[in-house]
A protein has these predicted regions:
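Membrane-embedded alpha-helical bundles of polytopic integral membrane proteins
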Residues: 1-153
């Protein structure tokens, strides 16, 4: 039990320190890291079930989907999470024809897209919350920390 309490306190200290020193940028980096690692774990679980998702490109597109709220404002306005998810479906549909057997094509596509919707698409909403800057500059940070605390406890 002491080990669990220690790890919880340590994780909260890391979160608070990152948010305090790096503000929203640090939070976005943490969220992206958690998103990619969670998606990796999801794909490993699917592989253990006997299916073959497109894990590498799925992780790359998953990181882009998580960062989509930032990409919309800094890179191009069409790089929304929805358009990246549609692009992922097209890329996987093209790759599936040449790389998978006809017997397991649907499963590969379904599990890969399910992972993208289940993990990074949902995490991008937390990035959106972090980017809220009104009525106070730290509104998004406070809301994100509150959301993490409520879901943790």
């Amino acid at each position: 039990m002491a080990k669990r309490i220690f790890s919880t306190v340590l994780l909260w200290l890391i979160i608070f320190a990152t948010m305090y020193f790096f503000r929203a940028t640090g939070g976005i980096v943490l969220i992206s890291l958690v998103s990619v690692l969670t998606l990796r774990e999801f794909y490993q679980m699917i592989v253990r079930m006997g299916h073959a998702p497109f894990a590498r490109i799925g992780l790359l597109l998953g990181a882009a989907i998580t960062l989509a709220p930032v990409l919309v404002t800094t890179v191009h306005p069409l790089l929304t999470a929805e358009s990246l998810l549609a692009l992922a479906a097209i890329i996987f549909a093209i790759r599936i024809v040449g790389e998978r057997n006809p017997e397991n094509r649907v499963e590969s596509l379904a599990w890969t897209l399910a992972g993208l919707i289940y993990v990074p698409f949902m995490f991008q909403f937390l990035v959106r919350i972090l980017l809220i800057d009104g009525p106070h500059a730290a509104t998004g940070l406070a809301l994100a920390l509150w959301l993490i605390a409520v879901s943790k406890f």
